[in-house]
Amino acid sequence: MAEGVVSFGVQKLWALLNRESERLNGIDEQVDGLKRQLRGLQSLLKDADAKKHGSDRVRNFLEDVKDLVFDAEDIIESYVLNKLRGEGKGVKNHVRRLACFLTDRHKVASDIEGITKRISKVIGEMQSLGIQQQIIDGGRSLSLQDIQREIRQTFPNSSESDLVGVEQSVEELVGPMVEIDNIQVVSISGMGGIGKTTLARQIFHHDLVRRHFDGFAWVCVSQQFTQKHVWQRILQELRPHDGEILQMDEYTIQGKLFQLLETGRYLVVLDDVWKEEDWDRIKEVFPRKRGWKMLLTSRNEGVGLHADPTCLSFRARILNPKESWKLFERIVPRRNETEYEEMEAIGKEMVTYCGGLPLAVKVLGGLLANKHTASEWKRVSENIGAQIVGKSCLDDNSLNSVYRILSLSYEDLPTDLKHCFLYLAHFPEDYKIKTRTLYSYWAAEGIYDGLTILDSGEDYLEELVRRNLVIAEKSNLSWRLKLCQMHDMMREVCISKAKVENFLQIIKVPTSTSTIIAQSPSRSRRLTVHSGKAFHILGHKKKVRSLLVLGLKEDLWIQSASRFQSLPLLRVLDLSSVKFEGGKLPSSIGGLIHLRFLSLHQAVVSHLPSTIRNLKLMLYLNLHVAIGVPVHVPNVLKEMLELRYLSLPLDMHDKTKLELGDLVNLEYLWCFSTQHSSVTDLLRMTKLRFFGVSFSERCTFENLSSSLRQFRKLETLSFIYSRKTYMVDYVGEFVLDFIHLKKLSLGVHLSKIPDQHQLPPHIAHIYLLFCHMEEDPMPILEKLLHLKSVELRRKAFIGRRMVCSKGGFPQLRALQISEQSELEEWIVEEGSMPCLRDLIIHSCEKLEELPDGLKYVTSLKELKIEGMKREWKEKLVGEDYYKVQHIPDVQFFNCDDEQRE
């Protein structure tokens, strides 16, 4: 558990020492001594990894090592950064700088020697206490494999007394299993405890399945297995009366099994396959010739797709509230009639906490089954948050079984993914995490593999999603993950792990017993503030590396610059929505020289100090502050050469001039203003993927186009509307032929939409607002073959008639027509928009009626009508009902009153 975090820290420190070797000259001897100790530590960590469970001494050892590694990294990086600040200062200060440098070097050498001695002492104490022998021999502590073997035993037995919510899933999978020959592998994935094995059992014993196949085998693979054992079990299941199987060698078993599967119709269930590599180890016995079929369960969706890219991949779903309560009532039948209503209310609250996880509901039911009064239930409810994932003080092993099963998914993670997972403990319950921000948090912590931050972070998140540790739905319209969050149960596991690791401290005004504060808060290097009223509790925590202020529901004012001075080692600082006294960001922010991430998103600030020039390591800088007064931004951002993400204020002082040409590593640049920066600054920003620009009077698209041509990797382009936005009008040079561009927003004046050949060939999403187009844009837009969504917002089109032609918009999924004040008639021809699923009509006061041709758009699933005349609703539930009768979900908002059809 902790060793993952510690190993990650050692790897980062080692990389830092190698990367900055030239700047560490003069203290070579001390650095070499530190490296020798790190080698020893790394070997010990490898030993500890296999035998760490059940030993407080091992955990304490790892915690000491983690502190030492962090301290060493802080010392080295501070020295390097201070040395960088002294370079290029001119001759005048040379002598003074030299004296300071010699003093710094002497101090750093002494500090490194101190760290080295501390490491040596820890190793010595470890040996004297016998911990090293325990690590090697294992003592009596349980290994992960022991725990795995103890709790993970599954059988094909069909007896399930508490089945709820699986009937539909069974029917969805049984059909393809017996009727579609081309489907050879069916994969069921989902988080631990969600009911994958239960669902597989029901399919395994279904009457249709039993009639269809000639033989059946069920094998639980789990984490620890041998190739021979799995093959042997399958063959035994298919040939139960063959007594010679146990005496066969591996080669013979492989041949017999291959021949058997090749000649008959057999169903093989591989339950709980953890890794793609596990499939690779056992796949040789499965012939290519079809006839046999496989049902595979895994926490990792990628395992099934790896086994067969054409497999039927099915995600087990959580129970809805009604199903959860139904399951709970089967386990805890009604007994106490006099207190039933009170107990029902308490019980439903606790069941909701289980988040639809069947195993959690069953465990909770088992805990309450022998408690017959409301007061007993209330006591359990008050402690359920901590107890359902912690070491239960109650004599009920089932609580620990839930924790251990869910924990196995965490234990299986590689070192860097463990770090990614633990970072999610920062966020409040049900918090929607913006993925792009999350990736930058990770990168600022050193979880960054050298690709772009976006690609690197997306790889990590998708792996966590595949392992069912994180929920992140990709909508039909998006090509990237936008938001993610944790299932409540998994979040509690995450927080529990972070607590054991001293990974972070959560600060908030205690409101319930579920509030979790890290053990030994003084050793925690990360803080997250969930309440503005708790901000003063920060105190002086000089070793803290990250501070996130999240989910503020009240005003948080920062009045004192000392807040920053007391946190000199910060790498991550998120002050979104914070208010600064006098609108000024304190100049002491410049002392946070280690800072990689700074967010002032929607913060109340109008003046940035020039001291931010000292933040040389900055990767992510969000200055998209709350709109109010123009913001003073000093021309020092050009010195942040490591920047990958930069979001500027939408409104800056008229005299602001920013030179950004040296920021060649930018992947994301938003609110770039042609008034405050030169378009020539863009020429070398060839890594940009997301770009938002606002025009000034002195710049037209033609001026900008030469720089835009350099953006060959661009995915999102936005011409941002503001009161200062100005464009003479559409010009013939308007060509946006970026092959990777998926999303285009136009907030500028155009008399007509550019022609089809002037727009990106693979564009998927177009948003138009304040364009004041006089010509109908639909004849052009409907020819874009890859277009999935179109939004026409405030005065995008000022004409009276709009037509969607037959055969147009072949892939369009979503259409929004909003605040088109002059639109009177909209015609939809039969055969237009054959894939449209979602339609929104909003505040088009002159639009007389819904198109008659909408009745031909049979793919429509949802229609929202908002801010329209009352007659619209009356007609659509009356004489015009034929236009919408095929749409499952029709909603009216602010047309009179809300109504759902």
Curated annotation (Swiss-Prot):
LRR repeats lie at residues 567-591, 592-615, 833-858. InterPro entries: Apaf_helical, LRR_dom_sf, LRR_R13L4/SHOC2-like, NB-ARC, P-loop_NTPase, RX-like_CC, Rx_N, WH-like_DNA-bd_sf. Keywords: ATP-binding, Coiled coil, Leucine-rich repeat, Nucleotide-binding, Plant defense, Repeat. GO terms for biological process: defense response to other organism. Residues 15-56 form a coiled coil. The keyword Transmembrane does not apply. Residues 144-453 form the NB-ARC domain. Gene3D superfamilies: 1.20.5.4130, Helical domain of apoptotic protease-activating factors, P-loop containing nucleotide triphosphate hydrolases, Ribonuclease Inhibitor, Winged helix-like DNA-binding domain superfamily/Winged helix DNA-binding domain. ATP binds at residues 190-197, 385-392. The keyword Repeat applies. One of its GO terms (molecular function) is ATP binding. Disease resistance protein. The LRR repeats probably act as specificity determinant of pathogen recognition. Belongs to the disease resistance NB-LRR family. RPP8/HRT subfamily. This is Disease resistance RPP8-like protein 3.
